[in-house]
Amino acid sequence: MVETIRIGLIGAGGNTRVRHLPEFQKIPDVEIVAIANRSNESASAFAAEFNLEVETSGDPYEVIGSSDVDAICIGTWPNKHREYTIAALEAGKHVLVEARMAMNASEAADMLKSSEAHPDLVSQIVPAPMDFKSWRTIKRLVDEGESGELGTVREVHISILNGQNLAPNPELHWRDQTELSGMNIMMYGITVEMIHRWLGPTEELIADGHTFISEKLNTDTGEMVEVNIPDSLSVLARQTNGARVIYNLSTVATPTSPNGATLFGSKGTLVWSFAEDTLSFTPLGGTAGPYPHDDRSVFGWQVESDFVESIRSKAPVVLTNFQDGLEYMLSLIHI
């Protein structure tokens, strides 16, 4: 008989509503048993909205310390990830924590150290989802090197532009606030996470960023608030495998071509579509065409089921473990 896994939720924001709660509810022998939010009233309202008969609280430590909870899903802003993750692991709970991993690399290192002190517990970060279908195929082509169709990958250019800050009077978002988001900048961390899957870790980098929209309206207070997190960022990185990566991210520029990444190999060029998670390939001297994903390599969103499977089977976490999370947080140090 399969033992029921009892989940406690901390944070009732967008991803918890759209992803974590409904996906956990699909898994047999998994129960949501407790919810904590910034107030008991908001936690109770969330439970009522989704017809959940669970314990509610405005204190996350009541959920973390509950003997009725086996695993914790942390859906808060990054400013609480280190605190709640370490507390949950020390309380003997498995942890699924929202991305970005932490406020900075130091906090991420603390989280990794705590997870290593509790090897019997699963520690997982919600992964970057944009390349779920393609990453295994890309990694295979990169790893094959000269023996494969792409050859040796020497350069990668990745561009993520959306122009959301071009709207008149853009409103303050938590990602604009250093006290909530830490060193995280736009989609840089999530993009680095994907690049690391494909190519391996970053060895060194140089970067230049600027904040063009330096004030935004805080709709809670009605006041204009200073913004220090860049809304335009360019990074030139070198990976441990020798490849050079050029990042271009901006929320004050609209794309003239589709967002995505281009991998330039010695035998051809591979293009990954950010919006579609599809691939196209142009052999050297040839014409471009769709490139199929490898057989048995295409998976959609299965974050919660992967988490539960790791708890039940003790399978190692692939997407995304704390070591890989620390690697992408380390890439923020020099920016």
Set out the residue ranges of the language-model regions.
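N-terminal Rossmann-like dinucleotide-binding module
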Residues: M1-N51
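Core-facing hydrophobic residues within beta-strands of well-ordered domains
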Residues: V30-I32, V69, V153, T202
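Active-site loop of classical SDR/Rossmann-like NAD(P)-dependent oxidoreductases
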Residues: N15, R38, W272, D294-S305, ...
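Beta-strand-loop-alpha-helix segment that lines the small-molecule cofactor/substrate pocket
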Residues: D70-P78, R82-M130, H334
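Conserved SAM-binding strand-loop segment of SAM-dependent methyltransferases
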Residues: E53-D59
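Contiguous beta-strand/loop segments that form the cofactor/metal-binding neighborhood of enzyme cores
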Residues: M186-T278, S305-P316
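Predominantly a Rossmann-like dinucleotide-binding segment in NAD(P)-dependent oxidoreductases
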Residues: L121, P129-V225, K314
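C-terminal helix-rich "cap/oligomerization" subdomain common to oxidoreductases
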Residues: T4, V30, A71-C73, A109, ...
